[in-house]
Amino acid sequence: LIDEGCHGVAVFGSTGQAQLLSVSEKISLLNELTKSKYKDNYLIGTGLNSLNETINFISISKSLGFNNFLIMPPAYYKYGDEDVFNYYSRIINTHQDIKIVLYNFEKLCGYKFSPECVNRLVKNFTSQIVGVKDSSYNLFETLKIDNFSILPGSESKLLKGLELGCSGIITA
């Protein structure tokens, strides 16, 4: 895919059924991916609800040379903007040298990013928060942040997204 012009590949996203894979299965696949010449082009989804497991998984991924992550807020419980801001803050305070694409997918995790929360995260963590995958489709039409990638999560939103200045798409 990358040889054909794709900028990167998301690994362990929702289509890849990340929530159904154990951490050991994910690590096993990451070990295989370390052999790829495209390692810097992989966006590693965490797919974990536990903050500590997410932080530990990022540590392991970093030790294997991966630094770009697709991170969804934890699922199941109802979280507000402050909870989500604190979740990402704790991750970034532990791993300040990573790049994060926020994963906005309310149907899967129960939380939909507000533009205010995204703006606050980017303002506070400009070097780490580099984009958002918008699978809830409430951000790609209105969010405007310099040097920030907005990536709709569906082919049906691609053309309109590109017309509105989106960077591309993350899709199956």
Residue spans for each PLM region:
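Active-site beta->alpha loop and helix N-cap motifs at the rims of alpha/beta catalytic domains
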Residues: I2-K112, V118, K123, I129
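Catalytic alpha/beta core domains of metabolic enzymes, predominantly
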Residues: I92-T94, F105-A172
